[in-house]
Curated annotation (Swiss-Prot):
Functional description taken from the UniProt entry: Required for formation and/or maintenance of proper nucleolar structure and function. Plays a dual role in the regulation of ribosomal DNA (rDNA) transcription. In the presence of high glucose, maintains active rDNA transcription through H2A.Z deposition and under glucose starvation, is required for the repression of rDNA transcription, and this function may be independent of H2A.Z.
Family label: Belongs to the actin family. ARP6 subfamily.
CDD domains for the chain: ASKHA_NBD_Arp6
Modified residues (N6-acetyllysine): K260
Cell compartment(s), UniProt: Cytoplasm, Cytoskeleton; Nucleus; Nucleus, Nucleolus
GO biological process entries: chromatin remodeling; negative regulation of transcription by RNA polymerase I; nucleolus organization; positive regulation of transcription by RNA polymerase I; regulation of DNA-templated transcription
Subunit and interaction comment: Component of the chromatin-remodeling SRCAP complex composed of at least SRCAP, DMAP1, RUVBL1, RUVBL2, ACTL6A, YEATS4, ACTR6 and ZNHIT1. Interacts with CBX1, CBX3 and CBX5.
Protein name: Actin-related protein 6
Species of provenance: Homo sapiens (Human)
SUPFAM superfamilies: Actin-like ATPase domain
Sites bearing N-acetylthreonine, chain numbering: T2
Gene Ontology, cellular component aspect: cytoplasm; cytoskeleton; nucleolus; nucleosome; nucleus; Swr1 complex
Gene Ontology terms for molecular function: nucleosome binding
InterPro entries (alphabetical): Actin, ATPase_NBD
Amino acid sequence: MTTLVLDNGAYNAKIGYSHENVSVIPNCQFRSKTARLKTFTANQIDEIKDPSGLFYILPFQKGYLVNWDVQRQVWDYLFGKEMYQVDFLDTNIIITEPYFNFTSIQESMNEILFEEYQFQAVLRVNAGALSAHRYFRDNPSELCCIIVDSGYSFTHIVPYCRSKKKKEAIIRINVGGKLLTNHLKEIISYRQLHVMDETHVINQVKEDVCYVSQDFYRDMDIAKLKGEENTVMIDYVLPDFSTIKKGFCKPREEMVLSGKYKSGEQILRLANERFAVPEILFNPSDIGIQEMGIPEAIVYSIQNLPEEMQPHFFKNIVLTGGNSLFPGFRDRVYSEVRCLTPTDYDVSVVLPENPITYAWEGGKLISENDDFEDMVVTREDYEENGHSVCEEKFDI
């Protein structure tokens, strides 16, 4: 019996058999301006000749799976002959779902996995639980950790003790990668070029040039300087999808600091946008979202827990999710949490080598556990007892 592990994120699906490597694939469908009638699914995005004005059709809205038609088509593609050629009669699945997921969504997922695809056994679990499992496996002496999962739709902060989540201390911040990309689109559209339709391109810009400032006001001052002294400023060459397929940053020595470029390249000049956008993760109130930033929320979450456990959480803070890849993210989280924490506590912030696939790797480890059979719901169980058996088994 093989096990398929699917970390079903709102932006990317991380998928692979437990005995193989993981693939990271867009969990959505696309339509392009040029081929209006054709819908591209998942990694077929690579086939689109001109991805400007790319239109996204997402199965998730505000972090919850609501568009089942799209999700089904993406899964059909992933499980089908193009990708994983799943033999449902001989396959179990570990699949992730968001925290505090709605019962109606859980029931739909049970029905689709058991009745339509007919997997032999299912384990439905939060991505954070998989990350915690991986962390405890790497650090067997630790009993507690706090998982910071900063993804596409939100950032969740979840303490785990002996692999059980502490529900009373879970915090959600409504800031994720989608909001950052949208904010960057608005700033660039207001200041330079109209890019409101260019989600795909601007998302790439964000990933290529943005970083987390260690000293916001100092970087702001540098960004105001003229010419050579402005070390923050960068010129980004936008793709034209004929000669330049993917945007890139101009090397510092090739930048024309005054006047125009001779070549016909389309250039975005970015200065304070580079760090002002990720800053929203630390100060959501900058754009009118009245919520705590990540470091403050970590401390607040830990302070909701029994005092004797708190030191164990402060020294096991684990960062996962795509936003933790911003340069400087880990250092900033560490320095701010350190400032907010009593001096007699140790603080340690861990950024795994690949924070995007960390939860998937946890799922792979769980599938190899001796007690894996006790965690799943088998198809016989489901056919006999329906949704109630899933509710009892899965601690969501």
